[in-house]
């Protein structure tokens, strides 16, 4: 039986050593530069008491957050897939209408960082769950008003399985992902046209957990969504010149 998310979070706080620093102290009295330094490398940038810490990616002010709420303004419970270090998680939770964000992340080191930042900024709406999203039972987490899947789908070897699971727990799905161009098609897998992409492994914080992932074409991606009951798919942005490959932003709904 899966333990309640709040119970998992309490265990994570102990397991990942967040309590090694005395959080009873005011933030101003903690050597934040040292605490961030000993947890590096960081991808996400965090602004705390007017100072920047961590990496260079400003997830808290990422435009994809506003795009998500443009299409799902009434989402009060959100499942985030691929939380990284919690930047998007906290930004989603900052919206007044949001009551709960469950942020699933596959790397324990990223969860430790996210929980550390959470103790600093006091965002109590976010619950972090360690989950390999290639095989984790998302249904055990319950139902959600919307799923936020940004920067994750193109890292899994079976994206069709992940979308099927999302469709079982939410009628609304936001996706930002890379995809294969029609001129890049190498394989037809599970009835989907696309290509295999080599992943960097566990040592790369921006890589998937498996050795390779499958990138479907845009047409195959949309077919996956409609096949799983998402009757309306909004193409928000199609980035044809993204430095890391073709990328698309979609909002899919069963309504």
Give the residues covered by each predicted segment.
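Conserved SAM-binding loop of SAM-dependent methyltransferases across substrates and taxa
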Residues: 85-97
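Conserved SAM/SAH-binding beta-strand->alpha-helix loop
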Residues: 107
